[in-house]
């Protein structure tokens, strides 16, 4: 039962963080790499130790839930994803995303092997869970489920379900809706099989590639969004709509070029992937740091889309995937540190009741209107159906209340026709046509007139039938989109839902048993400590103190090692930021050099006054650019070539092209200047030419 609008609870929860460690793969076994990760599922700890000869103590991290190499897909789903999806079905926003180094099993955790029920990942299992909940809902509850699928490839948002996957989409933001993707396609689904087909279609369009660390490496971040709208009657007697959004995110893995061997396009992709993941880490750090006043959500498309999921209106679960090999020791430690930091992010989730962008209420309204039209029947004028001439006599009536009389006449001339009535009218038309053919005493003109009248009535009847059928089809299509609670929609997903339920019950029993064992273990440890405190001699006391001292010394060395690693990591981040600043400074100086040498200062100031930064597309834009340059030149009238410009200068003798023919013509046309009286100069002033102009030109050209 939904709550009143005035009572919207706000759930303040931390981001749930779980860690999953995959087993050693065949390549790592063939290279004889050792296992450096130990998983204690009962205590929820991950211990990483160096396998070389160094005396560095192992590092231990504690999380909400941890999964070892032998963990099952169903267990991962029931312990981590099920609570999030239950919250989404109640109207909250939810986000589940996998984070970690490339090749650690993020895509397997999120998608799995869909052909095998036991190996399906979080996304396919959520399909059966959602429609299983709808099938168990009350009969007066209405649901609308729609999905969308996008990827972020090289910092470009692409629609994996659209016709053109290379088209770049824009990220927009509205106060009432929040961050959204403009022109992103969404499809209404009726069962889990529809969802699975759409996901398969989008997965085929996703960018993948091979590297040295992963044969099927994801080269983009993918976000599969499920929007669930639910309409039911509230305590005030009115229908309320709740809308929950579930974002299922499969992130591309962070890479080191030396290990992946990425070159060319793969290297460019890796650079963009690392940049967005670095921004994600900066966002996590800023949210955890209480002194930070700015969270850099806008520095990356990924963090912009996950803005609500990290520190906003969402219940979020982060699954950090790690590899067990000592070869990936540094990457494993980095992933665990980020995950450990993300535990402290606080989200404020609330139920989305009666949102403005809900489609369920709009569909229900259209269905009611269509049902009303079908019950009342199509309105066809009386003259079109009966062919009576009463309306013809009334058409000439004009009075002071002519408009009202016309309206009454129109209402009286309209009839409501049901499907049964249409059948009767069709039969009547057929009878009249037969009777018309049997009457031989009618004149040809009357016969043609009667036949035309019958054809007109038949056309009107056919049109009414087509409109009725169109309304039925439209109503059927809308009713298919709106799912009624309590209807069995599982179909093939019924087996998967059964597996999930059995696994959930088994997990409950195991959880109770683990809790009991944990309490017993704590009691045993407390008893051991009490026994150790009771010394019978000074020698035993010295041994006990020495053991405690060694334990404290180990903890001290671990803390120092952790501090040294953090300082080294911090120094690396500072050096990376400084290198970015130096690169940006070089690019800025180059741009300023070009601008100062090619654009006058006055025009620079004019451009600066009319330029603004577009946050949505990440580019500078000029105001009123539609009224400048080529856009205005297209509208400039072309002058008439016949009218000669009085100020036009004759440039016919100028050498526009230095060819032999043009040079010869220019010299032949050139005339000697005349005196002021208009008389030619005396012949004595001329010199005798030794050669013809053609020969001079030829010699010059040679």
Swiss-Prot record:
Regions of compositional bias (Basic and acidic residues) in chain numbering: 410-424
PROSITE patterns from the UniProt entry: KINESIN_MOTOR_1 (PS00411), KINESIN_MOTOR_2 (PS50067)
Binding-site residues for ATP, renumbered to this chain: 100-107
SUPFAM superfamilies: P-loop containing nucleoside triphosphate hydrolases
Sequence ranges of Basic residues compositional bias: 675-690
Localization (cell): Cytoplasm, Cytoskeleton; Cell projection, Cilium; Cytoplasm, Cytoskeleton, Microtubule organizing center, Centrosome, Centriole
UniProt entry keywords in alphabetical sequence: ATP-binding, Cell projection, Cilium, Cilium biogenesis/degradation, Coiled coil, Cytoplasm, Cytoskeleton, Microtubule, Motor protein, Nucleotide-binding, Phosphoprotein
Biological process annotations from GO: centriole-centriole cohesion; cilium assembly; microtubule anchoring at centrosome; microtubule-based movement
Domain of life of the organism encoding this protein: Eukaryota
Cited InterPro entries: Kinesin-like_fam, Kinesin_motor_CS, Kinesin_motor_dom, Kinesin_motor_dom_sf, P-loop_NTPase
A cellular-component GO term for this protein: centriole
Coiled-coil ranges (or none): 355-593
MF terms (GO), sorted A to Z: ATP binding; microtubule binding; microtubule motor activity
Record flagged with keyword Cytoplasm: yes
CDD domains, alphabetized: KISc_KIF3
Chain's role: Microtubule-based anterograde translocator for membranous organelles. Plus end-directed microtubule sliding activity in vitro. Plays a role in primary cilia formation. Plays a role in centriole cohesion and subdistal appendage organization and function. Regulates the formation of the subdistal appendage via recruitment of DCTN1 to the centriole. Also required for ciliary basal feet formation and microtubule anchoring to mother centriole.
Record family assignment: Belongs to the TRAFAC class myosin-kinesin ATPase superfamily. Kinesin family. Kinesin II subfamily.
Name the UniProt record assigns to this protein: Kinesin-like protein KIF3A
Species this chain originates from: Pongo abelii
